Amino acid sequence: MVTVCDIRGMVCQKFPEKCAESWDNPGLQLGRGDARVNRVLTALELTPAVVAEAISWGAQLVLTHHPFIFKPIKVMNDDTPEGRMLLDLAEHKIALLAAHTNLDSAPHAIAEKLADDLELCNRKPFLSHEPYATYKIVVFVPKTDAETVAQAMHAKGAGCVGQYTNVSFRGCGTGHFTCGQGSHPAIGTPGTSETVEEIRLEMVVSERDLRAVTRALHQAHPYEEPAFDVFKLESEVHGLTDLYGFGMEGDLPAPMTLRALIAHIKQIWDIPSLRAAGNADQMVSRVAFVNGAGAKFISNARGIDALITGDCGHHDFDNAIRRGIALIDAGHYETEKYIPQILAQTLMDSAFGNELEVQIAREMRNPFEVY
């Protein structure tokens, strides 16, 4: 039996949520972690058409790239399109999971796919991933409840180290306490002293998940006042951020003009038209790209002739021209339309692959057209 929590853990193993940007909101957006899953629909983003397809196909989980929920929701009702979509998913017991900038920055994901298409050599991440604060959380829990508390913490992102999930240390010990007269103890009675066989449970947790993990700990722990400690680690967990970065840069197989590079991009990614700034006859040897919206990173460009990305504005093109860098707007959708396939392949290649039916949403398209 595969659960939503199992799939989230596997996705986190491949695309650690710790490596998401601080403003991002990946992870489980809707649904119960213990819900069973045998059908998963992957999509770039959640749309009414994707919701309808998930319901029609009988999916129990929709796995998207773009998180549907970015900001706190004040109301969820059928007065808004967003509310209706979430209600439709909830009423059909369909969970919603997202892997966004944690996927964008991961090795062997979209950056590698686009670099392979361009046949880049001498590759390296265009933007190295900045490490985020890591904490160790230590909680003391009765031996009989240790697994329940551990699973609740894992479900909120604790215990992810590199390519491993559900990582913890457990040691046996003895807890001692005296119950106050106004207490409501799970073990013992008010006014008595108790000695309990307990487990010391330790896990690492990222700064962005710390609040959710401590909340889950409180909810799952049998004690009225759980005893736990949180320590900030002075060194980052090895292997978690050193291989991660946004985009890729590298050398083309052979120098070509900007005009020829544009024609090549249109052909390999099936793009009818695109926008670009720069001298069409200039020679281009080393290029960089950032899938999605990466024009804000022009100032980070060093030693490249052209930057390929999407969602470029007037001032982005002007900035690139001033810096002597060709800027190619290949489109947000066009540079990310392969991600649902990457998500689907990740599921099929996982330990749960034989237990899951995975389908890529058919109703995906660029939200706008060029006339």
Show which residues each predicted segment covers.
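Hydrophobic structural segments
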Residues: 1-371
